[in-house]
């Protein structure tokens, strides 16, 4: 029996977010109002008004998550009651392990799956799982190599299946639905895995046990953390992402309850409801939905099924992009997909929480052009003399408050680890963890404004016909040539130099306040090259800076 009160929780959370938003807006007004408000400052206030809901939501999720992480003996169970009711052991139901592949290196894909199948067999649960390799590979030569690799892999494994489509209609969502329509038989659940996903047998068995404990669960999405990375870029990025997702997902799960997220992989899904309710038709403009996962989640919610998040990171991993160019391309794909949600907001048959989820996904990327506009308007205002009466201390306080809220997920995750010694111990102790946190903060302070500018440029180009496909991802860790970095990032560099010079002509104080947001743009090319440099990667690994528990466990 649970005592969740969705209305009360959401009202309390809404009040917290509103209070944070009002504080941010008051601090901004307090900084800009003295001496009169110029036209540029009015536009800045408008942009701040639009980005503040996301910043306040981030801070609210982080504070609630941190409170649960510090105050509960079992944080995942505190926000997912079915976890406490789950029966450990061999499951009753048959579950498909559905791995979506397209033009992948099977020598990288298959070994983690072999370990998973072997460990499930060792737990005497092997006959309860069926591995399905769902291929959308179109290239004939790659398909032949793929089929040969799977055939060798399947020798001696009776529970391995392989299916390749000749037409990849509907992309990944269509791949999964084709499996459910034409190939699934007695499987009650399926666990979605990407080609770079890694899950342990313990994590898989826990997901099935949770689903069996609550027959109204449609999806349970587990937290996903980065696989141990060699390259500096993913190593630093995912160290902070891991800390941030821990607090964010815990806080969000507390108030979203049965209206949780689905991120497309490392999740368990009940087959029949998904097949009935999560089928995706074309958008009103005729295009296919790119970011399918959130839409599938809100469809199940609208049909009365529970979608929950399991904010536990153990045994659920993925590979992050190996370098800055791949990361930016992935962001562009996600941004293009999330912007499609504008068309879905007008459609009927979504719950209020479902629409809120879609709106959050839009705000995640819509904030980029708004933050870029704030920086550009601030430079124009400073050069034109509009900021002459602005008290710098008040402005610095407002900027710092927004910075705290923007980065609050990872900051609260860092606080959790440093305050709880047993968490920091998994990273080598508090000192080792603090070194990783400081390195990540320094790197991301340079990279985040650059990433924001890149998203802003991409989103601004979407109405003019720019498109991004869902091409196979480069997962190989490699260096970046200076020429390649310059060709990709010269616009970002020029914008950064122009903004920095603009603030420098006003005053040293203006330059000092702007540098945290422009320096990464100025250094875009070397930052891209250095973060992929094998020498820097080796230096970080040798000193175990930003090492994860999985890396330390195998070293």
Features from the language model and the residues they span:
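Basic/Trp-rich segment in TM-proximal cytosolic loops or flexible interdomain/linker regions
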Residues: 1-17, 33-42, 71, 75-80, ...
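Composition- and surface-driven signal marking solvent-exposed, interaction-prone regions
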Residues: 41, 111-112, 192, 205, ...
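Alpha-helical membrane-embedded segments
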Residues: 45-68, 404-407, 514-533
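Internal catalytic domains of large membrane-associated glycosyltransferases
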Residues: 60-63, 67-347
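Transmembrane-cytosolic junction motif
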Residues: 62-79, 419-422, 529-540
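Cytosolic juxtamembrane regulatory segments of multi-pass membrane proteins
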Residues: 80-103, 434-447, 480-485, 529-555
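C-terminal amphipathic alpha-helical interaction region
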Residues: 474, 482-555
